[in-house]
């Protein structure tokens, strides 16, 4: 079967419609939200606080919100800039709640991309060859104040796996060690190693500082991939879709 990922992407009027910029409003129950989320980023990264979210005439209550990112959080945060990236979980407290068919929103502040175009253009190119997160731009308002323009990127999670692969039991890792840009360190559960796919030994614990696991399991699979890459590259095709990886790198 010829791979045709286009059938999975939003059309006009969908959450990731890129024909125009819509605005998303987030109203936190606690006006002290920025201090709470800024502190918890380092001490309790999974902590979410409730907010009401309004987008394109749709209002959702009890949405779980936390800050996200590593470098794109640390750099503005340490400068006292409130334009940090957000992660919104629609069904954190209300089971099955979604926004236009999606249960998670990831709002990137494009801190390292003044053009706001890199992720959008990459998504448009990659989607022709492999499963790719959808991307568009939204204006974010928090507590009634305009926070700025954000890159709205589809979350690579179980819903994404179901959408493109028809199953959701795969292994997911975020290859970005926090602490590299954070003077405080420790954000998002890591201490700032580099995810270089370098073999560090058979003990999975030696990889904790460099990779953040996003699935229910997978450390052994990660070490197996890295070990095969170093010691048995001729067997790599058995555990890695080399063709799609090359398309992504190209």
What does each model-identified segment do?
Residues 1-250:
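Phosphate/dinucleotide-binding and metal-coordinating scaffold of catalytic cores
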């Amino acid at each position: 079967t010829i791979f045709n990922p286009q059938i999975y992407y939003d059309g006009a009027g969908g959450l990731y419609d890129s024909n125009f910029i819509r605005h998303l409003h987030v109203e936190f129950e606690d006006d002290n939200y920025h201090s709470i989320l800024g502190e918890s980023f380092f001490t309790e990264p999974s902590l979410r606080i409730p907010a009401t979210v309004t987008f394109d005439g749709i209002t959702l209550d009890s949405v779980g919100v936390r800050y996200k990112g590593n470098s794109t959080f640390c750099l503005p945060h340490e400068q006292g800039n409130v334009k940090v990236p957000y992660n919104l979980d629609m069904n954190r407290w209300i089971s099955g709640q979604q926004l236009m068919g999606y249960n998670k929103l990831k709002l990137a502040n494009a801190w390292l991309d003044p053009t706001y175009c890199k992720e959008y253009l990459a998504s448009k190119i990659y989607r022709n060859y492999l499963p790719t997160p959808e991307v568009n731009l939204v204006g974010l308002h928090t507590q009634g104040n305009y926070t700025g323009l954000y890159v709205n990127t589809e979350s690579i999670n179980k819903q994404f796996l179901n959408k493109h692969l028809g199953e959701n039991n795969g292994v997911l890792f975020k290859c970005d060690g926090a602490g590299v840009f954070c003077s405080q360190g420790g954000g998002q559960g890591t201490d700032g190693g580099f995810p270089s796919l370098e073999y560090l030994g058979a003990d999975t614990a030696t990889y904790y500082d460099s990779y953040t696991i996003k699935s229910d399991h997978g450390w052994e699979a990660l070490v197996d991939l890295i070990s095969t890459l170093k010691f048995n590259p001729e067997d790599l095709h058995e555990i890695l879709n080399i063709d799609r990886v090359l398309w992504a790198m190209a």
